[in-house]
Amino acid sequence: MLKRIKIVTSLLLVLAVFGLLQLTSGGLFFNALKNDKENFTVLQTIRQQQSTLNGSWVALLQTRNTLNRAGIRYMMDQNNIGSGSTVAELMESASISLKQAEKNWADYEALPRDPRQSTAAAAEIKRNYDIYHNALAELIQLLGAGKINEFFDQPTQGYQDGFEKQYVAYMEQNDRLHDIAVSDNNASYSQAMWILVGVMIVVLAVIFAVWFGIKASLVAPMNRLIDSIRHIAGGDLVKPIEVDGSNEMGQLAESLRHMQGELMRTVGDVRNGANAIYSGASEIATGNNDLSSRTEQQAASLEETAASMEQLTATVKQNAENARQASHLALSASETAQRGGKVVDNVVQTMRDISTSSQKIADIISVIDGIAFQTNILALNAAVEAARAGEQGRGFAVVAGEVRNLAQRSAQAAREIKSLIEDSVGKVDVGSTLVESAGETMAEIVSAVTRVTDIMGEIASASDEQSRGIDQVGLAVAEMDRVTQQNAALVEESAAAAAALEEQASRLTEAVAVFRIQQQQRETSAVVKTVTPAAPRKMAVADSEENWETF
């Protein structure tokens, strides 16, 4: 039955039983403590009542004694034989004692009453107290008034005896209550001890039952599981694991049995995998050796290619430098042609200015020729007029003739100058035309030189681009050479790793040989696992070889 109950449920039941025992014992102890508290309260109340009532009784007795002494002193003073304290001092002392009695009585009445105390007895003692107290107060008044006869005639002793009787009865009643409370305390203590013993017996019985249940449902299955775990740790995977019960221990045993089965399968797979790894590592080592040889050949080819690229880079750089110098020379020629074109433009402008000035001079000469013609006409008119004047106008005619001659010579000179100016203007026009033609030619030269300069610049730029491209190709080839060298090193490391893997596979095979599993399962797994990986590895090596040959 215990094997079918879950451990958690068992623990909850144990906790519930212990909790119930704790609650039961706690309730019983609480009841005992409650009774003890009530009895202690009764004892405390009785003690306080007795203390305050006794204080009031003593104060009343002291008041009466003081009043008796005061009365005697009063009588002695009347006979002139007194000495010691005066009547006034004794009466004051009696008043103080009476007030103390009143205070103690007030404290007594303020205390709570136990239900078991007699109400009639309390009322009777209060009545006798009031009588005795009032009698003492009356004695103080009588003695103060000098009524000594009434003072001694008062039956104070009877009042005192009555109060004392009730006081003794009340004290006897409190003593009985005190004895009852003590007896109840003793009974509560005995009951608590019996409860403690009973609870201890029940707890011991529950502990024994719990231990028996734990041993049957937890310890024994745990020992069996520990023994199975030790066999598994020793490499024995064949010994069966017993599953008994459906509680947590049964589930743990079932899980351990499942783990044993999985471990058997895993160990078989590890053995087969180790064999496959050993075979694959051998193939990898062979392929790596072949790959290492081809990598070395490829590295040598890349070194030759890198050397050729360096020579080609040097040649292209030299061509780029020559193209750059030719571009600079063409640029210089273009600048010179541009300056020549500017000079020709200036000459053309100057020739145009000269042509304009010559035209202006021709215009001025035309004006001079007109003036000479008009002067000649005027001289002719003057000669005609002088001829008409006869002898008187002869001198004027001579002058007019000279003026006419001068006008004719001026006209002749003007015509010659005009002819020369016109010839000069014609030549200047021809020169201007030639200079303009030369300017256009210089512009064409400048344009051609500019195009040549642009072409040379493009050639130089292309040469620079080619140089940079060849540099990049050289860097790429160098990087390929470096990567090839690294690949060669990695191939060597891979070969070493394959050898190490082969050794580790051998060690792994030796390590898993410690475990004992079913022979049939091991052989079946070995056949399946060792045959399948061979073809992919071969094809991987072939692909690698084809890639290297193509590269």
UniProtKB/Swiss-Prot annotation:
Membrane topology: Multi-pass membrane protein
Residues with the Glutamate methyl ester (Gln) modification: 297, 311
Glutamate methyl ester (Glu) carried by residues: 304, 493, 502
SUPFAM superfamilies named in the record: Aspartate receptor, ligand-binding domain, Methyl-accepting chemotaxis protein (MCP) signaling domain
Pfam family, one: HAMP
Record-annotated Methyl-accepting transducer domain positions: 273-502
Subcellular location: Cell inner membrane
Main location: membrane
GO biological process: cell motility; cellular response to amino acid stimulus; chemotaxis; detection of chemical stimulus; protein homooligomerization; protein trimerization; receptor clustering; regulation of bacterial-type flagellum-dependent cell motility
Chain ranges on the Periplasmic side, renumbered to this chain: 31-190
Gene Ontology cellular-component annotations: methyl accepting chemotaxis protein complex; plasma membrane
InterPro entries: 4HB_MCP_dom_sf, Chemotax_Me-accpt_rcpt, Chemotax_Me-accpt_rcpt_Me-site, HAMP_dom, MCP_chemotaxis, MCPsignal_dom, Tar_rcpt_lig-bd
Keywords: Cell inner membrane, Cell membrane, Chemotaxis, Membrane, Methylation, Transducer, Transmembrane, Transmembrane helix
Ranges of residues in domain HAMP: 216-268
Keyword Cell membrane: yes
UniProt cross-references to CDD domains, sorted A to Z: HAMP, MCP_signal, Tar_Tsr_sensor
GO function terms (MF aspect): identical protein binding; transmembrane signaling receptor activity
TM region(s), chain numbering: 7-30, 191-210
Membrane keyword on record: yes
Superkingdom per UniProt: Bacteria
NCBIfam families in UniProt: PRK15041.1
Family: Belongs to the methyl-accepting chemotaxis (MCP) protein family.
Primary role: Receptor for the attractant L-serine and related amino acids. Is also responsible for chemotaxis away from a wide range of repellents, including leucine, indole, and weak acids. Chemotactic-signal transducers respond to changes in the concentration of attractants and repellents in the environment, transduce a signal from the outside to the inside of the cell, and facilitate sensory adaptation through the variation of the level of methylation. Attractants increase the level of methylation while repellents decrease the level of methylation, the methyl groups are added by the methyltransferase CheR and removed by the methylesterase CheB.
Protein name as catalogued: Methyl-accepting chemotaxis protein I
Taxonomic lineage: Bacteria, Pseudomonadati, Pseudomonadota, Gammaproteobacteria, Enterobacterales
Gene that this polypeptide is encoded by: tsr
